[in-house]
């Protein structure tokens, strides 16, 4: 299967979700699937773990730092990002799209809205009291169901 994997967080900054995405892509390869990653930032070619994904990685562009949930998320969003997401989805012709943090205002939600392939989503955080999520919850409910 051709699997599109969307990471909302920039690969220019190390993080748990980014590492999870790479681990998932590596596992999918061992199972005979073809994973393709879309994320802001770029891989570190000096890091052999990241460099092995060079041919299947597409950068969604540079990211901006956004304070969120006691941390700083480096994400991108907007018309240029939306065009990159749509192009990646169209060119990828994926059998399945796996979106990490699908309601984060980032390329993740853009991919959720634009994908015509079946979508699997992974939520890495639980923020039931987040005002942002409470406000977005009603708007996003149809997209995540």
Place the predicted regions along the sequence by residue.
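Extreme N-terminal starter segment of soluble prokaryotic enzymes
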Residues: 1-3
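N-terminal strand-loop element at the rim of the active site
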Residues: 7-14, 26-79
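Histidine-centered beta-alpha loop that forms part of the nucleotide-sugar donor binding/catalytic region
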Residues: 8, 100-101, 123-127
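Conserved alpha-helical elements of sugar-nucleotide-dependent glycosyltransferases
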Residues: 16-27, 107
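Short N-terminal targeting/anchoring amphipathic segment
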Residues: 85-106
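Structural alpha-helical scaffold elements that stabilize or flank donor/cofactor-binding regions
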Residues: 88-90, 111, 142-144
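A short helix->loop->beta-strand "cap" motif at the edges of active sites that frequently abuts
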Residues: 116-118
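Membrane-proximal helix-turn-helix segments that form the acceptor-binding/catalytic region
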Residues: 127, 133-145
């Amino acid at each position: 299967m051709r699997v599109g994997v969307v990471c909302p967080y920039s690969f220019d900054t190390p993080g748990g979700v980014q590492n999870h995405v790479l681990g998932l892509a590596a596992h999918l390869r061992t199972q005979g699937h073809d994973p393709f990653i879309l994320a802001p930032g770029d891989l570190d070619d000096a890091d052999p773990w990241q460099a092995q994904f060079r041919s299947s990685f597409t950068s969604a562009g540079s990211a901006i730092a956004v304070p969120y949930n006691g941390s700083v998320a480096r994400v991108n969003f907007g018309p240029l990002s939306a065009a990159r997401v749509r192009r990646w989805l169209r060119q990828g012709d994926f059998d399945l799209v796996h979106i990490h943090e699908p309601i984060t205002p980032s390329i993740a939600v853009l991919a959720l809205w634009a994908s015509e392939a079946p979508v699997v989503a992974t939520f890495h955080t639980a923020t039931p009291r987040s005002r942002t999520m409470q406000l977005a919850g009603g708007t996003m409910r149809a997209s995540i169901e």
